[in-house]
Amino acid sequence: GKEPQKGASAILQAARMITEIESRSVFGYLSFNCGRISGGTGANVIPDSCEFSIGIRYAANVQYEEAIAFLKNLCEHVTVPGTSCTMEQNGYYPAMEMVDGADRLLSLYQESCKLLGEPIPQGIQQSGCSDTSFVTRIGIPALCSLGIQGAGAHSLDEYAIPSSLLVQCKKLVATILAM
């Protein structure tokens, strides 16, 4: 409008916050990604609202707690006069932390792969979401990413290789029988 200096830009505040949030990423430990942002009504109007979504990746549950504390603190200390911030958590997956018996389970799976003449996978721990994290959270060992093979997960280019399903099932059955 006529007096832009009287406005408080919610988008400017969001931009400052997003820059600060993403600068705190330490890949392999704790990382943040702003995957969506929306605000304002037009180029000639000081935006009075803005919202954005942050994805958080962590390998341990304590890192998630650190992330939430950091985000809450950031939200409580806005830097653009006349703006405010509210934070809403829209979902949570616990980290898939190592539990007793996980190494043994992986060894059984690797032996099953070897017996079937399949490549022997190496166990890796990475951040991200997995339904198995709810199982490991209560102390039950579990392995992740043992389903059908493919690529492009969660994208328009995602695909599965149907012929891999039988091989994957054989490896899982052999592992179960070895327990």
List where the protein language model places each region.
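Metal-dependent amide/peptide-bond hydrolase catalytic core
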Residues: 1-179
